[in-house]
């Protein structure tokens, strides 16, 4: 399968690129000049700006799947303005590049919601999802809350609180929806999504991510009503 990947130099994107290559897929990675060294060997390199579709729109085809992972690193409530300038703009430009290229599957990294914090981040990612849906391209939304990985392990201290929350019916659903996931789980889920295009839309949240996407994906209606 031919995959066009943005965010390939990030900790998640580089892991996914390596896994897709291991599975025998062709990966074309969008990178800024000077960032090539952070992309796994074997990727086809495309130089461009994720915030300007015109810099790479003619280099997307012939891709079957477009995977968009660009976003502000280490999201926090103080980065609301950055979310709109980077996460939202890059999502809009990705859709603008994917549509004319004729890709038949758009995989979008979103965020679990609703949640009691990071409202601006949730809002921007919801807007990104809406743009993907409006494009008409069959899509997969992957919605983690927090991804554990190199330099991202401090939330493990919250695991006892999650365990307690799962004991009570009133808090069980929220604890599952906002569960912590690992880099390996995210990598496997995204790779599974690439290889399993939906007819219209599928959504993976932490319960599905924890098993690498092997639980049935949820529809938009099911996710909204949970």
Where in this protein do the model-derived segments appear?
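Substrate-positioning beta->alpha
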Residues: 86, 90-93, 156, 177-192
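NAD(P)-dependent short-chain dehydrogenase/reductase
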Residues: 150-173
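Short-chain dehydrogenase/reductase
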Residues: 84-88, 118-127, 176-181
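NAD(P)H-binding glycine-rich loop region in Rossmannoid oxidoreductase-like domains
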Residues: 35-93, 97-100
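Alpha-helical substrate-binding/gating segment
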Residues: 164-167, 180-221, 226
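N-terminal Rossmann NAD(P)H-binding glycine-rich loop of SDR-like oxidoreductase domains
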Residues: 1-23
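Conserved beta-loop-beta element that borders a ligand/cofactor-binding pocket
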Residues: 130-153
């Amino acid at each position: 399968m031919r995959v066009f990947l943005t965010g390939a130099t990030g900790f998640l994107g580089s892991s996914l690129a390596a896994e897709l290559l291991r599975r025998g897929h062709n990966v074309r990675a969008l990178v800024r000049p000077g960032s090539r060294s952070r992309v796994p060997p074997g990727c086809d390199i495309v130089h461009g700006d994720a915030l300007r579709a015109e810099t790479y729109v003619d280099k997307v085809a012939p891709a079957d799947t477009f995977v968009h992972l660009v976003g502000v690193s280490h999201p926090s409530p103080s980065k609301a303005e950055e979310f709109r300038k980077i996460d939202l703009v890059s999502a809009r430009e990705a859709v603008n590049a994917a549509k004319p290229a004729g890709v038949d599957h758009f995989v979008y990294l979103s965020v679990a919601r609703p949640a009691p914090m990071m409202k601006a981040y949730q809002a921007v990612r919801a807007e990104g999802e809406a743009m993907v849906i409006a494009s008409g391209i069959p899509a997969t939304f992957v919605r983690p809350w927090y991804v554990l990985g190199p330099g991202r392990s401090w939330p493990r201290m919250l695991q006892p609180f999650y365990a307690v929350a799962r004991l009570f019916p009133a808090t069980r659903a929220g604890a599952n929806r906002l569960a912590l996931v690992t880099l390996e789980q995210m990598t496997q889920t995204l790779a599974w999504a690439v290889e399993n295009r939906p007819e219209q839309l599928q959504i993976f949240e932490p319960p599905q991510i924890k098993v690498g996407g092997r639980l049935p994906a949820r529809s938009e209606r099911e996710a909204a009503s949970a």
